[in-house]
């Protein structure tokens, strides 16, 4: 999760390959009219996001076990507000959000270097204003700084996910509502 240009899709692709889990870019789940708005430089409103969040949650809730016996899926999506994350949690079940945090100047630079993406760099300010950074009460969120190489970011994400899962185990070794590595 994070604003556009923070590296969500790149990290999700790397995690998918490393963990053997299916990955979906949340951009693919937007309704056509929402894509048209963003392409025109118009920020989305909550009403535009509800169907998109429902599609994300549905994808996660219906992820199946892969041939290696792992269940879960990875979705790259912004999930900027607590209410958006709560909607995904309520519909998809236990999830882990990876919050990609970085300086606006770095993110804007990345966005300006992208080719063929409908999200314009001019919408970054709107996303930063909308962003509700996760609080300490959101225990299913792992914060990661984007001020590092992609390979280091991927390695740090995996290390923190493993630690998160280990922390989710009860003392007798049984899983206590630990996610099946559903990542956003």
Feature annotation, model-predicted:
Residues 47-94, 100:
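Glycine-rich phosphate-binding loop used to anchor ATP phosphates in small-molecule kinases
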Residues 91-111, 144:
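Conserved phosphate-donor/acceptor-positioning beta-strand/loop module used by diverse small-molecule
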Residues 162-184:
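C-terminal accessory "lid"/substrate-recognition subdomains
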Residues 8:
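Conserved lysine of the Walker
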Residues 29-30, 79-81, 102-106, 149:
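Conserved nucleotide-binding/hydrolysis micro-motifs of P-loop NTPases
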Residues 13-58:
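Conserved substrate/cofactor phosphate-moiety recognition/catalytic segment
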Residues 3:
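P-loop (Walker A) phosphate-binding loop of NTP-binding proteins
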Residues 113-156, 165:
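Small-molecule kinase domains that catalyze NTP-dependent phosphoryl transfer to phosphate-bearing small molecules
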